[in-house]
């Protein structure tokens, strides 16, 4: 199917969506060659995390609902190597182009996020998922090793360098 990408590294498949002239994966990446607990932070070594999991067994982590629904949380060294061949982390300019196409900063969030309250906390007002991007509230791993905000907020890396240490 031309609207599905299969990652040859692990067999995970992802819907492909086109918004304006940009091509995006329609789900969060699930590539995870290893897994770390939230207390195992690093600015230099790749670390892969599954929200709420505090272990190192990849098979156990992949069996969790969070993994199959929300994907993997990556620190920066993992994020830069997680993309399959032919894909890249969107730059700040690409995110800005997407945001502008979706109506600007005040409107884009609703147009790009999943509708309903299965994954987003109620009331999730304004969510239309107009383009099939289906953004999910993955939360993040704070730089003190605390998982935060699943169900409330979604965060994505940009390929454009800036400060910050959260995953």
Question: Positions of the model-derived regions?
Answer:
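Conserved positions within compact, well-structured domain cores
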Residues: 1-167
């Amino acid at each position: 199917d031309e609207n599905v990408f299969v990652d040859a590294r692990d067999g995970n498949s992802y819907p492909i969506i086109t918004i304006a002239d940009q091509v995006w994966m329609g789900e969060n990446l699930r590539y995870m060659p290893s897994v770390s607990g939230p207390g195992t932070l690093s600015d230099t070594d790749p670390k892969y995390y599954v929200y709420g999991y505090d272990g190192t067994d990849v098979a156990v982590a992949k069996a969790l609902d969070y993994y199959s629904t929300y994907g993997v949380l990556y620190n920066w060294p993992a994020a830069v190597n997680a993309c399959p061949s032919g894909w890249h982390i969107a730059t700040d300019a690409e995110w800005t182009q997407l945001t502008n196409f979706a109506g600007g900063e005040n409107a884009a969030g609703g147009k790009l996020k999943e509708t309903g309250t299965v994954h987003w906390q109620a009331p999730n007002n304004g969510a239309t998922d107009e383009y099939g991007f289906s953004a999910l509230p993955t939360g993040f791993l704070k730089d003190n090793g605390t998982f935060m905000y699943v169900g409330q907020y979604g965060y994505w890396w940009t390929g454009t360098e800036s400060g910050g240490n959260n995953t």
